Every structure is written in structure tokens, then in C-alpha cells.
A protein has these predicted regions:
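Short, polar loop/linker segments at the starts of domains and inter-domain junctions
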Residues: 30-41, 59-69
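Intrinsically disordered, low-complexity coil segments
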Residues: 15-19, 75-83, 150
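Mature N-terminal segment immediately following signal peptide/propeptide cleavage
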Residues: 8, 12-25, 39-49
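Surface-exposed, low-complexity/disordered Ser/Thr/Gly/Pro/Asn-rich loops and linkers
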Residues: 58-87
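Short linear sequence elements within intrinsically disordered, low-complexity coil regions
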Residues: 26-28, 46, 51, 66, ...
Length: 201
């Protein structure tokens, strides 16, 4: 915690926060979302997760895949990191989960949960309750969790993160791509809600 009114749920891994985050591929989780987001659920076979972070950088941290920025590890032809256009969205859909305490000093106050930078879709579960669904690039939300958290006790936050709806492919390049998206791959990535940016050299 950085002040008495806010709690940052940063992971111990990499960020040196106070919270243990775990992750597991959603397709390998047979339990219901309600159970996953409930106290006592067994995550002993889940991987450590980096939060804030991404599915891929957590997988790289766990040595599931090599560092994408080294050499040609990230080239499609290398096959070292599965490309979503080949393996599908489910391959990179993951659960993230942590436990957190709500201080006694929060009693009688309105308590908000503020997820930041979600990409691309997410379900936000707290203590067995689906409280929000997010859609878009680097999305934030403000969720009133007052009636769903237990003050002075341990609580569970579980987030199911989905990649973009239409990943597109790295090739072939298409001049007939959707809208203005002519610069890479088949342009289908532009069918998703994205952010405006400009690049140049």
C-alpha cells in the first residue's frame, strides 16, 4: 500500500509488491468462475504471474517461452512463441488470481476496485461474484465493491483475460484491408476496438 486510502495489488514477482498473483490457462481450469474466485480454491499448480503485466510476459518469466525481444525468437518462422493467428484466442485466454485483505479502517466507507490497462477483454470476479466485464484496449474501470468485499478479512480477486476478438495474421499484406489499416498483415486487427496512435521515423 502506498497510502492509507489506496491499496495497489502489485505482484511480488518483478514489481516487488505485496501480493501473490497466480495464473492458469482458462481452458485448463475445469472449475466454475464462482469457485475460482472463492477463498480456499487450490491454485498450487498455477504459475506465478506478473501484475501489472501481460499473459506473454508472465509466460516468459516462467520460462514457458523465450524472451521475444532477443534475436529472432519472435519471428513467426521460428515457431518459438505460438502465434495467436495459428493457435487461436483460447490459447492465450488466462485466469489471473490473488488474495487481498481489506483493512478495518475501510469499514463504513465506499470501496472501489480500479482495474487499469486491461487488454483486450476481461471478466472481473470478486468473492464469487462477476462485477464487471471490460472490452477494449488498455481499458480502466471503477467498480463499487463495497457490498462484495469483507472488511478485515481475506478476499479473492480473479480476472479472466481474453485476447483481441479478431487477431488477424502477419501475412499476406492486403491493400484491401478494413478502413485505414493497410500497413501490416491482413489488416483484420483493425476490426477490434483499439487506441489511436501515430508512428513515424
Amino acid at each position: 500500500a502506498r497510502d492509507s486510502k489506496r491499496i495497489w495489488l502489485d505482484s511480488k514477482e518483478i514489481h516487488h509488491g505485496e501480493y501473490v498473483w497466480k495464473m492458469k490457462k482458462a481452458g485448463d481450469v475445469i472449475s466454475s468462475a464462482e469457485k475460482v474466485s472463492t477463498l480456499g480454491y487450490d491454485t498450487s499448480d498455477w504459475l506465478s504471474a506478473i501484475v501489472p503485466g501481460t499473459v506473454l510476459n508472465s509466460l516468459v518469466y516462467n520460462k514457458e517461452y523465450p524472451e521475444p525481444y532477443y534475436g529472432v525468437n519472435n519471428k513467426l518462422e521460428s515457431g518459438k512463441i505460438p502465434d495467436i493467428s495459428k493457435v487461436g484466442r483460447e490459447f492465450y485466454t488466462y485466469w489471473f488470481r490473488t488474495e487481498f485483505d481489506v483493512p478495518e479502517s475501510f469499514a463504513g466507507k465506499t470501496i472501489w476496485l480500479q482495474p487499469d490497462g486491461v487488454n483486450y477483454r476481461a471478466e472481473i470476479w470478486v468473492n464469487g461474484n462477476l462485477l464487471s466485464t471490460l472490452n477494449g484496449m488498455f481499458i480502466s474501470d471503477y467498480i463499487n465493491v463495497t457490498d462484495f468485499v469483507k472488511v478485515g478479512r481475506k478476499n479473492i480477486l480473479a480476472v479472466k483475460v481474453y485476447p483481441v476478438d479478431v487477431p488477424g495474421t502477419t501475412m499476406p499484406k492486403s491493400w484491401g484491408a478494413t478502413g485505414e489499416f493497410h500497413n501490416g498483415g491482413n489488416g483484420n486487427i483493425g476490426l477490434n476496438t483499439t487506441m489511436l496512435m501515430s508512428v513515424g521515423w
